[in-house]
């Protein structure tokens, strides 16, 4: 953490590549640093200048009289390795490489990037970048920036970690228009060394940061990110915008910074489990953060709306309810506080519609009544522009209550021109405001979700005894791809799962012998792992009623597969189950960055049709297993609805937790499907009917 402190709070800085040419990156970077009011010492290396902007220049790095804490490198990429070595020789331990032209520029740039990565590791010099705009720290005791693209932002409590410098600049510019400040801004660029995990941990412990924003293109250290984000998100909200959430977006990410985007599903699972709030646009990133930074989190979901327009009030109500909030009718006590001071035609139910004639005094009466109502958790102020309203007076009413911070206060000022004078007051006061009801509703909903998230919830994990031979099975078959079905079944049985009765057979005589233990009707399946989609490829024959039909089915199956696979004679016979059961799916997928992802949902032939599934990263806690079961749309049918019998949900939970534990034990598993799993009535169990495992 010491290096990150130097990165953001350097006592002295060395600029290599500062320029006299106005408008150049080297010139603007130095100018912005000076204008920001930086409290430390600035050293400049430029062999062709005596001074720049009143600061003395040195010909070489070794000529600098002291050892600066931080180096800021602005030279062309080709010279960066040489400059980095010279900085290390000087004793500098931390460097920001602003220069572009590395991995994002093609093969030659990638070679240069690998070279500077090697220098960093061998010499112990920490690097932010390359291809970034560096850092901003608005702390009055520091006032430091390496940003060449925009002015120093207003001081605030939001910090921003971004892989894209352009996104940083856009967010800063938008924030300036709203009067919202920042504490720290860090542009990571190509992340050759310092990454978002280290920065997240640092900001998690930073007293001047209340809300953390992140723009992510790729996470290289996925497991560490989850560990850190889980810890930090309990102290302060983390809002993340993940780029590359579509196949086209993933390709754009690859060409933009040389990163390969992970699967959207994986990232969404990671964010959800780590307590990270995912947003879908840079606008949402800012809009939500401004509320988080300025207002207390709601204690409940009850919202009181004050408005001067019926239509927008309805839109706001719909948006709030759609996002999980409640707009309940007000108590008679609250109505009576408002009634004597407003039009007899005003609606006092909720929304409180004061009509177009509302002025600042009427608004204040209504706002005060809702603010004092203990049944209201958040006050939602919504005003449509009206020429007869003194918007500046209204803005002062808003500011007065928003600054109290005893209750969540959300402001929506619709329109632009006619509300601008009021907006200017809110901007100066640092009060967040929204232009439209739906955005404000989503921001408030996320604030409530975070409020619920930080309430203490225990996490308990269940351990199981697993047969050690499972490891031997998997090691022996590692790298073979999908393993044979009989081997899948043996692994699952040794892991404690219940399966439908089954036997393996190698020839007709063996088949007749084994069927006596299973009984009719039965199911015949090809056992070879080479046949991945058994049902589609004719590798499953259902409802076989007698020995004659069984032998005929076996002969047909052998004929079908003898030219396609090696072990075409090996088959599985299972008891054909008919009756009252529901089908679910359980699965695992190993992700290179994050480890095993566990899937649960509606199973059987409906998996691909309805895609009613949910995911968690392994290990899964007992509480998370409960959440998974409740999250799918099919849950009411498992619980019992409209005369349906309740299913064995405890056994489903046992299977989820057992699978999670198995994934921690059997790391060789790359992919697993348990589908279908038949779930019977409560206390009557669940049984795996089919499975596939890839190692």
What are these regions (language model features)?
Residues 1-695:
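Catalytic-core regions of core metabolic enzymes
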């Amino acid at each position: 953490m010491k290096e990150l402190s130097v990165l953001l709070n350097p006592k002295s800085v060395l600029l290599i590549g500062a320029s006299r040419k106005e408008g150049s990156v080297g010139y603007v970077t130095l100018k912005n640093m000076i204008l920001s009011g930086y409290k430390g010492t600035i050293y400049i290396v430029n062999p062709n200048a005596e001074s720049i902007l009143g600061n003395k220049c040195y010909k070489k790095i070794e000529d600098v009289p002291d050892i600066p804490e931080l180096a800021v490198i602005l030279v062309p990429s080709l010279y960066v390795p040489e400059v980095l070595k010279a900085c290390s020789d000087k004793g500098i331990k931390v460097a920001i490489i602003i220069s572009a032209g590395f991995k994002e520029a093609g093969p030659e740039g990638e070679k240069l990037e690998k070279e500077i990565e090697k220098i960093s590791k061998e010499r112990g010099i920490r690097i932010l970048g390359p291809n970034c705009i560096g850092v901003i720290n608005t702390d009055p005791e520091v006032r430091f920036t390496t940003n060449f693209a925009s002015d120093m932002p207003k001081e605030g409590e939001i910090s921003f970690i971004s892989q894209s410098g352009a996104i940083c600049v856009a967010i800063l510019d938008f924030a300036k228009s709203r009067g919202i400040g920042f504490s720290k801004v860090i542009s990571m660029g190509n992340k050759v060394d310092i990454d978002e995990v280290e920065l997240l941990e640092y900001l998690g412990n930073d007293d001047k940061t209340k809300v953390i924003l992140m723009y992510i293109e790729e996470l290289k250290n996925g497991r560490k990110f989850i560990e850190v984000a889980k810890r930090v998100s309990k102290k302060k909200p983390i809002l993340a915008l993940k780029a590359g959430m579509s196949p086209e977006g993933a390709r754009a990410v690859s060409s933009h910074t040389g990163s390969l985007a992970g699967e959207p599903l994986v990232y969404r699972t990671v964010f959800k489990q780590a307590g990270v709030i995912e947003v879908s646009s840079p606008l949402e990133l800012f809009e939500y953060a401004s509320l988080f930074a300025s207002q207390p989190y709601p204690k409940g979901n009850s919202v009181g709306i004050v408005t001067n327009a019926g239509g927008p009030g309805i839109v706001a109500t719909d948006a709030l309810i759609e996002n999980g909030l409640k707009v309940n009718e007000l108590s008679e006590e609250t109505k009576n506080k408002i009634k004597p001071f407003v039009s007899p035609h005003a609606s006092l139910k909720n929304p409180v519609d004061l009509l177009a004639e509302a002025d600042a005094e009427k608004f204040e009466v209504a706002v005060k009544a809702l603010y004092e109502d203990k049944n209201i958790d958040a006050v939602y102020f919504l005003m449509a522009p009206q020429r007869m309203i003194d918007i500046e007076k209204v803005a002062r009413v808003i500011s007065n209550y928003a600054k109290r911070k005893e209750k969540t206060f959300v402001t929506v000022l619709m329109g632009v021109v006619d509300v601008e004078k009021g907006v200017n007051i809110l901007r100066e006061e640092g009060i967040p405001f929204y232009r439209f009801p739906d955005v404000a509703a989503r921001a408030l909903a996320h604030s409530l979700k975070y409020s619920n998230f930080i309430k203490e919830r225990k996490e308990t994990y269940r351990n199981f005894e697993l047969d050690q031979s499972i490891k031997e099975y998997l090691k022996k078959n590692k790298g073979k791809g999908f393993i044979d079905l009989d081997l899948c079944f043996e692994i699952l049985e040794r892991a404690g799962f219940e399966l439908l009765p089954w036997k393996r057979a190698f020839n007709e005589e063996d088949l007749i012998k084994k069927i006596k233990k299973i009984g009719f009707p039965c199911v015949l399946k090809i056992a070879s792992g080479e046949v991945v989609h058994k049902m589609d490829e004719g590798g499953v024959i259902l409802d076989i009623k007698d020995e004659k039909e069984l032998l005929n089915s076996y002969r047909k199956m052998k004929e079908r597969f003898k030219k396609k696979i090696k072990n075409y004679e090996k088959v599985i016979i299972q008891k054909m189950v008919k009756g009252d059961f529901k089908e679910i799916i359980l699965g695992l997928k190993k992700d290179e960055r994050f480890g095993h992802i566990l899937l649960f949902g509606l199973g059987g032939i409906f998996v691909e049709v309805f895609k009613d599934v949910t995911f968690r990263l392994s290990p899964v806690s007992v509480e998370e297993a409960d959440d998974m079961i409740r999250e799918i749309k099919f849950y009411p049918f498992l619980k019992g609805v409209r005369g349906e019998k309740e299913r064995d949900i405890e056994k489903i939970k046992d299977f989820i937790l057992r699978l999670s534990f198995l994934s921690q034990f059997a790391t060789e598993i790359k992919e697993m499907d348990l589908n279908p799993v038949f779930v019977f009535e409560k206390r009557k169990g669940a049984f795996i009917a089919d499975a596939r495992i890839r190692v």
